[in-house]
């Protein structure tokens, strides 16, 4: 998402900041590359301690099924800790938009990492607390066979009390479902090697490991090759760069890559950190957890449950864990969202979901 200026703000928000019953003052907004999704942030005029976030989705750019799935997962999780709470959804067919409305007062982890003047992340106990909450959120998702598919710093929100909420379920799916969207720098080797595969919970686990490194180093996109020409950026280049961080040669053959990903031997590759990176992390238990999250063979990557029991996180998770957290009641029959959806059915299902928000 990139920030946009006041002049670039599209209607219907440019001239009228009142949407339905929400009265707010627009402060900022950002958009994705093709303008299909725009996120607005503003101050709630009726309660200035709260911000209002409006995610505008253009229906012409995103399939009915994808829009409804995002709303479905947001409603499914709205009463759970560690997840963004959806306040309302609005449909404007004449403007061709859906509005998802959230109320809170948060900043993204991405913003905290990018803030050069902010010493917030210099507190290593606070970093551990953030990592614990993200991990517990993934534990809840995976216990319910939900894969987020786009865990990254912009999708992790933190409030003034350092409470974490995971947001943006536009790529979420149930296990064994395909999901087309991904962010290359947080995608695991097996997916970069073959994007046709169906991602599972181990994809989220890889992203968690990347985020851990970035929190300790206060650096975004740890797996981004800063020396690479933009024209050369593709999944193969990205995969080779990731493998180089494990000390594995570049220009490796596809056959050798497949052997690494499906390696069943006891041989394990770990990230080779620079001396200054080790000094910044300065926690052997954290390094051990990172090495167990960032395993090239997905079958050998630990689960969120096991990560919570690790030496690094166990002080927060002791007494909190259950091997089963399947406690979520589904707002509608999910099978309604698995087939192609007509415009008429879209409106019917949308209204069904909207009725469930205030339950």
Locate each region found by the language model.
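Activation segment signature within eukaryotic-like protein kinase domains
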Residues: 130-131
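C-terminal lobe substrate-recognition/regulatory segment of protein kinase catalytic domains
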Residues: 246-289
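Short beta-strand micro-motifs within the conserved protein kinase catalytic domain, predominantly
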Residues: 85-98
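Glycine-rich ATP phosphate-binding loop
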Residues: 38-44, 48-58
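C-terminal intrinsically disordered, low-complexity extensions immediately downstream
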Residues: 319-359
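Catalytic-loop of the protein kinase fold
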Residues: 142-158
């Amino acid at each position: 998402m990139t920030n946009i200026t006041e002049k670039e703000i599209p209607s219907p928000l440019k001239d009228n900041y009142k949407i339905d019953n929400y009265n707010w003052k627009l402060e900022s907004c950002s958009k994705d590359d093709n303008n299909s999704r725009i996120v607005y942030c503003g101050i709630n005029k009726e309660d200035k301690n709260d911000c209002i976030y409006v995610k505008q989705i253009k229906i012409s750019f995103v399939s009915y099924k994808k829009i409804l799935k995002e709303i479905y997962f947001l409603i499914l999780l709205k009463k759970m800790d560690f997840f963004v709470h959806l306040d309302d959804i609005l449909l404007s067919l004449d403007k061709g938009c859906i509005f998802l409305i959230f109320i809170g007062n948060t900043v993204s982890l991405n913003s905290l990492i990018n803030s050069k003047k902010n010493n917030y992340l210099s507190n290593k106990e606070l970093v551990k607390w953030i990592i614990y909450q993200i991990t517990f959120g993934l534990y809840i998702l995976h216990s319910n066979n939900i894969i987020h598919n786009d865990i990254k710093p912009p999708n992790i929100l933190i409030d003034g009390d350092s409470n974490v909420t995971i947001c943006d379920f536009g790529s979420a799916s149930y296990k064994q479902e395909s999901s087309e969207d991904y962010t290359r720098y947080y995608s695991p080797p097996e997916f970069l090697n073959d994007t046709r595969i169906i991602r599972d919970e181990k994809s989220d686990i890889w992203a968690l490991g990347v985020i851990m490194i970035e929190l300790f180093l206060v650096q975004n996109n740890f797996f981004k090759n800063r020396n690479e020409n933009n024209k050369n950026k593709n999944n193969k280049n990205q995969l080779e760069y990731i493998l180089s961080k494990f000390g594995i040669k570049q220009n490796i053959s596809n056959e050798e890559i497949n052997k690494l990903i499906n390696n069943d031997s006891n041989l394990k590759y770990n990230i080779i950190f620079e001396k200054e990176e080790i000094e910044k992390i300065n926690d052997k238990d954290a390094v051990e957890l990172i090495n167990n999250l960032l395993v090239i063979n997905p079958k050998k990557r630990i689960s969120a449950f096991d990560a919570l029991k690790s030496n690094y996180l166990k002080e927060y998770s002791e007494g909190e864990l259950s091997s089963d957290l399947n406690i979520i009641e589904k707002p509608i029959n999910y099978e309604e969202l698995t087939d192609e959806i007509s415009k008429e059915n879209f409106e019917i299902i949308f209204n069904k979901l909207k009725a469930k928000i205030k339950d």
